[in-house]
Amino acid sequence: MPLPKQQTYTIEDIYALPDGERAELIDGQIYYMAPPSTTHQRVLNYLNTEINLYIRCRDGKCEVFPAPFSVYPELEGDDINKYLEPDISVICDKDKLDDKGCHGGPD
């Protein structure tokens, strides 16, 4: 018996998810994320603060973005097959940023 054909998802499927639904798109497959735990959020908040302070104390030009923040690591024309939401992203190259997030890998 043949295996059922696996559906390939696109960035449009990610955009169509209900508000608050967190997921990543990797090679055409959607990976849903469970809500973060309280401990996870505490650690994320601590790291976000420490990284921001480190950058500011050194007069750095980078920006820190905690999740949810959209990262499009690879772009090939209009065919976006990867969409990630890292816990923390540090962006130093402002040309990577637009209203939707970061285009290219975070720094």
Give, region by region, the residue ranges found by the protein language model:
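Gly/Pro/Ser/Thr-rich low-complexity, intrinsically disordered segments predominantly at protein N-termini
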Residues: 1-107
